[in-house]
Amino acid sequence: MVRPLNCIVAVSQNMGIGKNGDLPWPPLRNEFKYFQRMTTTSSVEGKQNLVIMGRKTWFSIPEKNRPLKDRINIVLSRELKEPPRGAHFLAKSLDDALRLIEQPELASKVDMVWIVGGSSVYQEAMNQPGHLRLFVTRIMQEFESDTFFPEIDLGKYKLLPEYPGVLSEVQEEKGIKYKFEVYEKKD
């Protein structure tokens, strides 16, 4: 079974997603709660969601918050020989991770699959064939960044007018405005 992939990201107006291994903007508590809720909430009783992230993203998470709780965590790395402490699984590539998820012992436990970063993992996911959703928080300001989100090909991805559980009005925290968007492609 090929399940839909979901990418979730917060991105500044200049497409920045990271700076020095952290977010380019000050912590936005409600935006973080949205990330937690979306990636944790399973619609199937007895199943858990699964998050896939690159090695740098894993190590950018404060140690006390690793692994992301109530989710199965897969870390991608070509260099590491075993999963970093706290991670549930290690895979060499996104394709390897997706194959791993379809193994019987995992397939029966996993509900939604979420890609949580970084840039190259998002890029690889967005180029996958099939059903993909992008959950994008648009931070409506520019922030100095050293890591960026790939361009969304609007020929492939359609911005949905609304999505269950996603607020459509502009949010504001700490003087920073942002809005939630959901894009989808099916091919």
UniProtKB/Swiss-Prot annotation:
Q: Which UniProt keywords apply?
A: Acetylation, Cytoplasm, Methotrexate resistance, Mitochondrion, NADP, One-carbon metabolism, Oxidoreductase, RNA-binding
Which Gene3D superfamilies does the record match to this protein? Dihydrofolate Reductase, subunit A
Q: Where is substrate bound in this sequence?
A: E31, F32, K33, Y34, F35, Q36, N65, R71
Pathway in which the depicted protein is active: Cofactor biosynthesis; tetrahydrofolate biosynthesis; 5,6,7,8-tetrahydrofolate from 7,8-dihydrofolate: step 1/1
Q: Which residues carry this modification: N6-acetyllysine?
A: K33
Q: Which residues carry this modification: N6-succinyllysine?
A: K33
UniProt: NADP(+) binding residues:
10, 16-22, 55-57, 77-79, 117-124
The chain positions of domain DHFR read: 4-185
Enzyme class per UniProt: oxidoreductase
UniProt catalytic activity: (6S)-5,6,7,8-tetrahydrofolate + NADP(+) = 7,8-dihydrofolate + NADPH + H(+)
**Which domain of life does this protein belong to?**
Eukaryota
Give the record's GO CC terms: cytoplasm; cytosol; mitochondrion; nucleus
Q: What does this protein do?
A: Key enzyme in folate metabolism. Contributes to the de novo mitochondrial thymidylate biosynthesis pathway. Catalyzes an essential reaction for de novo glycine and purine synthesis, and for DNA precursor synthesis. Binds its own mRNA.
Q: What family, per the record?
A: Belongs to the dihydrofolate reductase family.
Q: What is this protein called?
A: Dihydrofolate reductase
Origin species, per record, is Mus musculus (Mouse)
